[in-house]
Design a protein with these regions (language model features):
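N-terminal binding-site loop/beta-alpha segment at the start of enzyme catalytic domains
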Residues: 1-89
């Protein structure tokens, strides 16, 4: 079944303006470090990101050394963006 984000997700989070850019960032970001390596099942990673987004988190911290192995967190998050969040990008 396709993922459908919570309609009230932006009401659940405080957002702060980033300088004069007009960009708003959530008060809480989600770091995808050891919980997004190849040793974590894809369904678990998918559930983490979906829940965070449903709570209004729109900023996800990634780095090329997150894993293990290094880079696997970026690959996993990219796959979730492609499959679950294409309609919200």
């Amino acid at each position: 079944m396709p993922y459908v984000a919570a309609e009230n997700r932006y009401e659940k989070m405080l957002y702060n303006r980033c300088g004069r850019s007009g960009l708003k960032l959530p008060a809480i970001s989600l770091g995808l470090w050891h919980n997004f390596g190849n040793d974590t099942p894809h369904k678990t990673k998918q559930a983490i990101v979906r829940r965070a987004f449903d709570l209004g988190i729109t900023h996800f911290d990634l780095a090329n050394n997150y894993g293990p192995p290094p880079g696997s967190a970026e690959t996993a998050f990219g796959e979730i963006l492609r499959t679950d969040f294409a309609a919200y990008r």
